[in-house]
Swiss-Prot record:
Recorded topology in the membrane: Multi-pass membrane protein
GO molecular function, one term: protein-disulfide reductase activity
Any one annotated GO CC term: plasma membrane
Annotated organism of origin: Coxiella burnetii (strain CbuK_Q154) (Coxiella burnetii (strain Q154))
Intracellular or extracellular location(s): Cell inner membrane
Domain of life: Bacteria
Function field: Required for disulfide bond formation in some proteins.
Biological processes per GO annotation: protein folding
Protein's recorded name: Probable disulfide formation protein
Family as reported in the entry's similarity comment: Belongs to the DsbB family. BdbC subfamily.
InterPro entries from the UniProt entry: DiS_bond_form_DsbB/BdbC, Disulphide_bond_form_BdbC, DsbB-like_sf
Amino acid sequence: MMVFRLLKNYSLYFAWLTALIATLGSLYLSLVRHIPVCDLCWYQRVCIYPLTILLGIAAYRTDRGVVKYALPLVVLGFLFSIYQYLQQMIPGFAPINLCGSTSPHCSEIHWEIFGFITLPFLGMLATLIMSFFLIMAFYSLDKRLAN
């Protein structure tokens, strides 16, 4: 019960920390390790990077109303991630080609561990974790308004 209370009270901080780790990790991989960034990766970044600032400010101010603005970005980032992951893991899965001709193809795997963990998989994982914490923040907001 104490762990649940801790997660509920600090859910915005945990969501912000997840966004921060995802942002810094993607910047490290592209700027330091020089892993090429495809178009779908850029779309995922567009969804995740603003969350680092939004969730950081919201966590500092304990503004749980940010969930209404952050959750759509998280869901959109998840959709881009799962689409790219399916493109990488299922040969021939690409009904819609979202990659341009100047960037690397979105189905190319540039980094992989254990045979299934790729960069889009980590993006999916980060968005699922953020969704969990944002939903916890939303429901703790409802409880506070009811009291």
